[in-house]
Each structure stands twice: as structure tokens, then as C-alpha cells.
């Protein structure tokens, strides 16, 4: 996938790709981490993950299946609506409360700690949401917080 543009660029002596934009977040890790990250690391490319907040699921807005019933985003988050998905959100909410941040801010700060990630991509529909996104650029998570999020993420992956 990424190797074709790399090899063609080298063969044709044209500029090589410098970044990719994968689907990557606490709920969607394996495809990027297992397949793409090794190529990105070898090619010294940047990573700009999209859906960093999993279509809003990682903001703490959805804490139970009942919270998702009338959501216009249900089709985008339906894979996450299960006990393991809600447990991950509970862990995000818990860490956010401990450090005085919003869950979405914590989720994006976690992404920033990942190898090769240059900057996560997340959308906002209000000024308040923009403030949370900006706060993620300076929020530093402790190793314990990262481990707790990794564990919750691993439990979610195992539930699929």
C-alpha cells in the first residue's frame, strides 16, 4: 500500500510521500500498529491519524447504549457500543477527572504519545470543542495513565 508510492517515487526520481493519514485511535489500533507503522518508521514518514476521537465516542458523550440510541453518529460508532467500548470510555473519563481535563483531550493526548504520530486530526462543531482539542497539544499523560489507556484499549481489541 505505502510501499508502492515509495518505490515508484524512487524509480521515477520524484518526491516521496512524507505522511499518511490512517484511521487510528484508542479503539482502532491494530491495522496501523501491525501493518503500517513499521513501513512508516522505515520511511521516516509522519502520521496524521483521522477519527482521533472515534466519531465522538471517545469524548465521554456516550457512556451507555441508551446514550447512543438517537445519535446521528450511531452508524459510525456501532462497532464500539459494547461493554469493552464503554469500559474504555469509563477509563478515559476517570483519567480526565484525575487530571482536570476532558475525555476527548485525554484521548488525543494519548495519540500524541504514540510512535510516529505527528498530529491527530479531530473535528469540532463548537468553540468549546476547539478549546478541548487545543488543550490536547500541551497535556502530558503520565506513564501510568498511558498504561491504563493501553490496557483498556487492549481489552476492547480482545472483545472484537
Q: Can you say where each PLM-predicted feature lies in the sequence?
A:
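Beta/alpha (TIM)-barrel catalytic core signal, keyed to glycine-rich beta->alpha loops juxtaposed to Asp/Glu
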Residues: 1-151, 156
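Conserved histidine-centered catalytic loops in small-molecule metabolism enzymes
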Residues: 158-160
